[in-house]
């Protein structure tokens, strides 16, 4: 099998990025490819805009899962690549095009040369939001083929091609989207005493919420509150009746996440009194921590040291969010970082991963799964 063909597949997928639960063209592309594979050992199920593909083993005693995400981000691409996005305003800026092409490469191998045990390939939509891992896990389709272990990867611009970074235990943080609205009383800019200015209220709240991190969280622990978007008012000479804050909370434990949320809501009650306004929290996506199973991770590290001794890099815990954590909360397994050596970070409009990582990852995963 020519592994370089999956670089071409990546380029085709890169041109049709679609956001969460809108991945219809992506699903159709994947189905078209999978339907051309030898079908003797394959079974395929649709789940919303995603897919579940089972490869029957030759003498199975268990099912091994492999998950890839398939959605893109609402980002306007600025790479200038010949195969850049054809969907204006959308981009595979988090590497899910590489993730899919790698999964297809591994699937292609086992469709013709099945392993001893069953393999389940999960093509999951909506990782970037609103979160597809938890609902697909709760589906009847997944329950019927539920794996005994499950693995996944994520590209990492900061590592070189050929490097794989992993650690037992916590790899990625708990992440919660944060949406806060402030409603007060608008008015003329010349009469501030007759209004309740929500730009002032929201701005003050941004600063005050950071004291939660510095004064309510154990300094030996870690948490981050980030406000990435502020919007308030409509015109420069009118006091804003409403204001909105959008951001994220990231913690290294569910307990710390609970502390942050409790304090935020307590602050909000004080703000309602102090600024004579209404403060409302709106639910967003939650991402459970990616907690690698120690035994499964140790086995993979041993495999790397034996078969790819120059590839293994000890990873550190990161504040990155990934809903693969929901899989690992109920199924043993792990996720690892795959080096792609890009000067631009994940979610950057100029992210351009080195494609040599694709055949390398396919080879590693095939050999690892064959060793199971």
From Swiss-Prot:
Keyword presence, Lipid metabolism: no
List the Gene Ontology MF annotations in alphabetical order.
N-acetyldiaminopimelate deacetylase activity
InterPro entries in UniProt: AcetylDAP_deacetylase (IPR023905), Amidohydrolase (IPR017439), Bact_exopeptidase_dim_dom (IPR036264), Peptidase_M20 (IPR002933), Peptidase_M20_dimer (IPR011650)
GO biological process terms, semicolon-separated: diaminopimelate biosynthetic process; lysine biosynthetic process via diaminopimelate
Q: Does the keyword Transport apply?
A: no
Gene3D superfamilies according to UniProt = 3.30.70.360, Zn peptidases (3.40.630.10)
Q: What is this protein called?
A: N-acetyldiaminopimelate deacetylase
Q: Which UniProt keywords apply?
A: Amino-acid biosynthesis, Diaminopimelate biosynthesis, Hydrolase, Lysine biosynthesis
Q: What does this protein do?
A: Catalyzes the conversion of N-acetyl-diaminopimelate to diaminopimelate and acetate.
Protein family according to the UniProt entry: Belongs to the peptidase M20A family. N-acetyldiaminopimelate deacetylase subfamily.
Query: Per the UniProt record, which EC number(s) apply here?
Result: 3.5.1.47
**Reactions performed catalytically:** N-acetyl-(2S,6S)-2,6-diaminopimelate + H2O = (2S,6S)-2,6-diaminopimelate + acetate
Positions annotated as active site in the UniProt record? 69, 128 (proton acceptor)
Pfam families reported for this sequence: M20_dimer, Peptidase_M20
Its pathway, per UniProt, is: Amino-acid biosynthesis; L-lysine biosynthesis via DAP pathway; LL-2,6-diaminopimelate from (S)-tetrahydrodipicolinate (acetylase route): step 3/3
What CDD domains does the record point to?
Answer: M20_Acy1_YkuR-like
Q: Source taxonomy lineage? A: Bacteria, Bacillati, Bacillota, Bacilli, Bacillales
């Amino acid at each position: 099998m020519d592994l370089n063909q999956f670089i071409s597949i990546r380029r085709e997928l890169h041109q049709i990025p679609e956001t969460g639960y809108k991945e219809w063209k992506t699903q159709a592309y994947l189905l078209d490819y999978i339907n051309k594979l030898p079908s003797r050992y394959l079974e395929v199920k649709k789940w919303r805009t995603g897919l579940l593909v089972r490869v029957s083993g030759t003498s199975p005693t268990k099912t091994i899962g492999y998950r890839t995400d398939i959605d893109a981000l609402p980002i306007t691409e600025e790479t200038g690549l010949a195969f850049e996005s054809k969907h204006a305003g959308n981009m595979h800026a988090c590497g899910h095009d590489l993730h899919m092409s790698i999964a297809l490469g591994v699937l292609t191998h086992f469709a013709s040369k099945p392993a001893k045990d069953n393999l389940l390939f999960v093509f999951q939509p909506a990782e970037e939001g609103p979160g597809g891992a938890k609902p697909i896990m709760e589906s009847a389709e997944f329950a019927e083929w539920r794996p005994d272990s499950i693995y996944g990867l994520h590209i990492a611009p900061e590592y070189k091609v050929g490097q794989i970074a992993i650690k037992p235990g916590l790899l990625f943080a708990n992440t919660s989207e944060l949406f806060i609205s402030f409603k007060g009383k608008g008015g003329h800019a010349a009469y501030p005493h007759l209004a309740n200015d929500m730009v002032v209220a929201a701005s003050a709240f941004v600063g005050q919420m950071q004291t939660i991190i510095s004064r309510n969280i154990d300094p030996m622990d870690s948490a981050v509150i980030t406000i990435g978007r502020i919007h308030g008012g409509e015109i420069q000479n009118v006091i804003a009746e409403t204001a909105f804050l959008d951001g994220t909370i990231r913690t290294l434990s569910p307990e710390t996440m609970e502390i942050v949320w409790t304090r935020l809501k307590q602050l909000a009650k004080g703000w309602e009194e102090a600024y004579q306004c209404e403060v409302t929290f709106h639910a967003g996506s939650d991402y459970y921590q990616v907690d690698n199973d120690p035994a499964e991770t140790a086995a993979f590290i041993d495999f790397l040291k034996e078969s790819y001794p120059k590839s293994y890099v000890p990873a550190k815990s990161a504040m990155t969010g990934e809903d693969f954590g929901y899989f690992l909360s109920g199924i043993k397994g792990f996720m690892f970082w795959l080096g792609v050596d890009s000067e631009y970070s994940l979610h950057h409009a100029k992210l351009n991963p080195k494609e040599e990582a694709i055949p390398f990852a396919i080879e590693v995963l095939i050999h690892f799964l064959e060793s199971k």
